Amino acid sequence: MLGHSIRRFTTSVVRRSHYEEGPGKNLPFSVENKWTLLVKMCLFFGSAFSVPFLIVRHQLLKQ
């Protein structure tokens, strides 16, 4: 009995909740402007790519 009422409550909550739908609406960043997206992605992936090279440079200069 309790399980049925809990299940009914959760399904009614899910049905009542609504969020914006569409491409790019479920992402934590905006994809509306392609140039800012390009800059953000280049900084994100470029920094991750350059970290090993910077570590090696630091180790070589340290000796």
From Swiss-Prot:
Keywords: Acetylation, Membrane, Mitochondrion, Mitochondrion inner membrane, Transit peptide, Transmembrane, Transmembrane helix. It is found in: Mitochondrion inner membrane. Signal peptide: none annotated. The chain crosses the membrane at residues 34-60. It comes from the Eukaryota. GO terms for biological process: mitochondrial electron transport, cytochrome c to oxygen. It holds the Pfam family COX7C. One of its GO terms (cellular component) is respiratory chain complex IV. It is a single-pass membrane protein. Residues 61-63 are mitochondrial intermembrane. The modification N6-acetyllysine is found at K25. The modification N6-succinyllysine is found at K25. Pathway: Energy metabolism; oxidative phosphorylation. The keyword Calcium does not apply. Component of the cytochrome c oxidase, the last enzyme in the mitochondrial electron transport chain which drives oxidative phosphorylation. The respiratory chain contains 3 multisubunit complexes succinate dehydrogenase (complex II, CII), ubiquinol-cytochrome c oxidoreductase (cytochrome b-c1 complex, complex III, CIII) and cytochrome c oxidase (complex IV, CIV), that cooperate to transfer electrons derived from NADH and succinate to molecular oxygen, creating an electrochemical gradient over the inner membrane that drives transmembrane transport and the ATP synthase. This is Cytochrome c oxidase subunit 7C, mitochondrial. The gene is COX7C.
